[in-house]
């Protein structure tokens, strides 16, 4: 896995707290708004982004009304994500502004609009994985990492 930038400290439910687990953060739930741990738990994460747990810290768990009672301290990063792009943009090592391609095939939605990336994100192309077809056209499937502003 390609990792750029520093790990982010956050809290996740005990059942999810395993290295390698990926999740999408959708924003704080109602109980988070008044929780004393919200700053470290949800305050470090960006809604709509994908995160991957690198390490579970060996600290005691904390109580939480959402995660079946307990959360653990973990280190997370934004992982690389696969996305289909226009072939002319597919140059390994280049940084592009992400522009999603329309694809009418619902089974390929995750390749053309993957969760964790937004239209207009700056991304670095890590690897070119191959071709993917949709609507009679061929696109390049690439692995990208988001570049933070």
Curated annotation (Swiss-Prot):
For this protein, the record's PANTHER family field holds: UPF0179 PROTEIN MJ1627
User: Species name for this entry?
Assistant: Thermococcus onnurineus (strain NA1)
Q: Which cysteines are joined by disulfide bonds?
A: none
Query: What is the recorded name of this protein?
Result: UPF0179 protein TON_1048
Which domain of life does this protein belong to?
Answer: Archaea
**Record-stated family:** Belongs to the UPF0179 family.
The record ties this protein, via Pfam families, to: UPF0179
Coiled-coil stretches are: none
